[in-house]
Amino acid sequence: MEKVKAKKQYGQNFLKDSTILDKIIQSMPNNNNHIVEIGPGLGDLTKNLVKYKDLTAYEVDTDLIGILKSKFAIEIEKGNLKLIHTDVLEAWDKLKNLHDGKYDLIANLPYYIATNIILRAFEDELCEHIIVMVQKEVAEKFTAKTNDKEYSSLGIITELISINSKILFDVPAEAFDPPPKVTSSILYIKKDMSKSLDKDFNKFLKACFIQPRKKLSKNLTTIFDKNIIFEIYKELNINDNVRPHEVSSSLYSQMYTKVKNGRNK
């Protein structure tokens, strides 16, 4: 069969290293959850996942859909694999949930939409575990804590929505075909299924970090009324000189609740 060329517009880098594939399988939680895979590519991870659990895979590339249907004809016929040809973000817009029961997201994500996919998985109340391949710098942002250099809105949201988050291991460029120009990491997040976040909370955090090295109050008063921010600082005993990376996730949550009760400029 003619070699399939990766398409840049879909951010395709096919994971081929069997050792890495095995390590991903070993990291799967021991539960009865369904599995959702986004961007199965040529099916190298899919082949391993479907041995253990039923699987729903979302693929946007028409050429790859044909290959996957042929490669997994038996699994599809048996009902072990459901292959959906669509853009996964559009699917989330229409369906709200990627599966009709509790599921774990396990995938080698395209770099260019990885952050958006993880944030949507946070919103999906049926998604419990997230085990995904992403660019190392992205994984570090999702797992960063207060005062870390990489600390941003992503780390804050992750800390508030999860029970556990960590980088399991790094993956070198040579594990892929074609090799990307960056190091990748496997990011693991176990969500706290009792928690959910206000959709506008992320917008609030982005405003807080719009100039990350400036004082937090400076960032906030460009969007919100100065008197409201002053009162919130006073109520929560926040130092006026504090920078965005020095504030804990729980304090950001308290600030947001109070800002919601105030008024925009």
From Swiss-Prot:
GO molecular function list: 16S rRNA (adenine(1518)-N(6)/adenine(1519)-N(6))-dimethyltransferase activity; RNA binding
Binding site for S-adenosyl-L-methionine: 13, 15, 39, 59, 87, 108
Role according to the record: Specifically dimethylates two adjacent adenosines (A1518 and A1519) in the loop of a conserved hairpin near the 3'-end of 16S rRNA in the 30S particle. May play a critical role in biogenesis of 30S subunits.
Entry superkingdom: Bacteria
EC assignment: 2.1.1.182
HAMAP family from the UniProt entry: 16SrRNA_methyltr_A
Keywords: Cytoplasm, Methyltransferase, RNA-binding, rRNA processing, S-adenosyl-L-methionine, Transferase
Main location: cytoplasm
SUPFAM superfamilies to which the protein is assigned, alphabetical: S-adenosyl-L-methionine-dependent methyltransferases
One GO cellular component, as annotated: cytosol
Pfam families: RrnaAD
Name the UniProt record assigns to this protein: Ribosomal RNA small subunit methyltransferase A
Source lineage: Bacteria, Pseudomonadati, Campylobacterota, Epsilonproteobacteria, Campylobacterales
Similarity-based family: Belongs to the class I-like SAM-binding methyltransferase superfamily. rRNA adenine N(6)-methyltransferase family. RsmA subfamily.
